[in-house]
Each structure stands twice: as structure tokens, then as C-alpha cells.
């Protein structure tokens, strides 16, 4: 799933009076609960924009104060389960009660989003389809937050709990609390 928003309405909506003055990249999101991605390059990607010519503008934040909750989703055997591009310092998105299993990279946040009350499994026994060692969390641009999550299998020899790689701008103070093992 790719949440990519234009700054202004695109055709055919751009020609309709109903959408005059609308700014899709600042509008509240609707519900997105109980969704699943399996065997994808990216399970969920947020914080990109579209230009009026339909070209992709990377790291364009969804500029709404939120909070918005992605509830009860499952991400299995993806290259990357959850990815959020640079979204400013807003803490406007919470990934709540998710199940992440057998992904190569579980969580890559270039923003201040929160993963809460979720279960993150390194290897369910079914293996990831890409055959690579799993990484739970990239210490990326962030700083993301992990709150009250349950971890399974991250003590295995092939599993990586953290990957300390920053990108364009590395914000310190990623926060982790309430983990159970």
C-alpha cells in the first residue's frame, strides 16, 4: 500500500468545482484497518507526494496533525514491512496492533511515527521468501518510537534487532519502551 498524495487535485478532479482549493496532502485520512501485505517490496509506504505532472516527489509529508491510526494490520514476508519517508517532526501516525513476520526489514521510519502494541516476529518458521536475514528496526532518519511491543525470535543468530544506518538527516532519540520478549 502506498499512501502518496498530490498537493492539489489531479485530473479529472482538478476540473471539478467541488475540489477547488482542496489540498489532498493535508486532508485527514479515512480508515485503513485490518489490511495485509504479503510478499511485496513494500507493505506500507507513507510520506511521498505527486506533482501536477504525476511525477513522484519523494519525502513529501502527509501534512495533517492527526493522529491517524493504522489498526490491526499484518505484514508478512515483505522486503520492507513499514516505511515512512521524511515527514517533518509531526507525530501524526500510529501503527497499532500490527503483526509483522518474516520481513527482511520490518520498520524503517524517517519520521516520528509510533509502532505500538504490535508483535514483531523475526522468523515464524515459514521463512521469508527472499531468504535474507531479518532486521527489526533501522536507526534511520527518524526518530521513531516503539511502545509496548512483543518481540519473537530476535535472539536468533541470523536476526538483527537494529540496523544503524542513517540517510539524509539523522535525528537522535529514537524511543523504545515496554518491550516484551
Locate predicted features.
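Extracellular beta-rich repeat passengers
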Residues: 2-181
Amino acid at each position: 500500500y502506498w499512501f502518496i498524495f498530490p498537493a492539489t487535485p489531479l485530473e479529472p478532479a482538478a476540473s471539478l468545482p467541488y475540489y477547488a482549493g482542496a489540498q489532498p496532502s493535508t486532508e485527514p485520512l479515512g480508515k485503513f484497518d485490518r489490511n495485509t501485505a504479503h510478499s511485496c517490496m513494500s507493505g506500507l509506504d507513507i510520506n511521498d507526494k505527486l506533482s501536477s505532472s504525476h511525477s513522484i516527489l519523494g519525502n513529501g509529508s502527509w501534512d495533517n496533525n492527526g493522529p491517524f491510526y493504522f489498526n490491526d494490520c499484518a505484514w508478512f514476508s515483505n522486503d520492507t514491512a513499514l516505511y515512512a519517508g521524511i515527514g517533518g517532526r509531526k507525530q501524526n501516525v500510529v501503527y497499532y496492533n500490527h503483526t509483522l513476520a518474516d520481513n527482511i526489514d520490518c520498520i524503517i521510519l524517517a519520521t516520528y511515527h509510533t509502532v505500538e502494541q504490535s508483535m514483531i516476529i523475526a522468523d515464524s518458521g515459514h521463512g521469508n521468501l527472499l531468504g535474507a536475514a531479518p532486521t527489526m528496526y533501522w536507526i534511520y532518519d527518524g526518530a521513531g518510537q516503539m511502545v509496548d511491543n512483543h518481540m519473537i525470535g530476535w535472539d536468533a543468530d541470523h536476526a538483527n534487532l537494529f540496523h544503524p544506518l542513517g540517510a539524509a538527516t539523522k535525528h537522535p532519540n529514537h524511543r523504545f519502551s515496554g518491550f516484551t520478549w
